[in-house]
């Protein structure tokens, strides 16, 4: 397997952020929500008509990466699947390359699991194509930097009307009195959030007032976590939300139905 150091400096992936990726939670050899992650990756490529990685080769690469990592059964890592453009002709499969790597979960992500201190991002900072999981990641990188400089651990993008959309690397859900709600549009279709919601959700504008009455973030490595503060002001953390988060995270880490053995 080629390594990132082999990518030419003038590759579309480097110069233009041309590529797609998925980050999968790996618990031992168990890839959490593996099939939904693959469905999102291949669905995006088919939607735009880009060449696709050979699925058996991808699965073999993932198993090889898991072999090399040799994780104990309960140890967690991030499994990164990256399909990046290294050649100039995007119509040619030979211009694309698959990289599969196992990485430590960032300490900042692990710290967020105890409760997120979210920061509202400036209105002019937004993703170029928010419903696509691409490597064009300026807004996310800049947004997280802004949040950290403000004393937070996650930045929240907003819509033109001021309502909230999602985090830089997480999905945003309002507890909404026990009927969880997401933004109607303008956010990535999150694999982890979909598993948490199980099809039961409302689509409503996520206002600051609504979030302060109870909200959570979902991400493949973050898991589900309560938002404990927004722009420095404490948020309510309803007990029922806490219970559901705890049960969901337990299932993510241990339920065979929510993972695939590599």
Task: Describe the residue ranges of each PLM region.
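Helix-start/capping segments and mature chain N-termini
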Residues: 1-56, 60-64, 91-262
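Short, acidic/charged, Gly/Pro-enriched secondary-structure junctions
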Residues: 59-89
């Amino acid at each position: 397997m080629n390594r990132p150091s082999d990518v030419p400096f003038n590759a579309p992936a480097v110069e233009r952020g041309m590529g797609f990726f998925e980050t999968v939670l790996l618990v031992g050899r168990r890839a959490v929500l593996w099939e939904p992650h693959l469905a999102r990756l291949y669905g995006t490529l088919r939607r735009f008509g880009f060449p696709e990685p050979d699925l058996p080769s991808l699965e073999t690469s993932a198993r090889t990466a898991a072999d090399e990592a040799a994780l104990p059964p309960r140890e967690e890592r991030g499994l990164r699947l990256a399909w990046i453009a290294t050649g100039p002709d995007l119509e040619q499969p030979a211009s694309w390359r698959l990289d599969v790597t196992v990485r430590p979960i960032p300490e900042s992500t692990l710290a967020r699991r105890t409760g997120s201190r979210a920061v509202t991002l400036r209105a002019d900072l937004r993703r170029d194509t928010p419903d696509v999981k691409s490597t064009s990641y300026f807004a996310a990188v800049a947004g997280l930097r802004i949040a950290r400089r403000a004393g937070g651990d996650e930045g929240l993008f907003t819509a033109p009307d001021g309502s909230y959309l999602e985090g830089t690397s997480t999905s945003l859900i309002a507890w909404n009195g026990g009927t969880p709600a997401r933004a109607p549009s303008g956010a990535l279709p999150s694999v982890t959030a979909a598993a948490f919601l199980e099809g039961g959700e409302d689509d409503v504008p996520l206002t600051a007032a609504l979030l302060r009455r109870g909200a959570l973030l979902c991400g493949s490595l973050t898991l589900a976590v309560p938002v404990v503060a927004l722009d420095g002001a404490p948020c309510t953390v309803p007990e029922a939300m806490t219970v559901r988060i705890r049960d969901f995270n337990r299932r993510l880490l241990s339920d065979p139905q929510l993972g695939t053995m590599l």
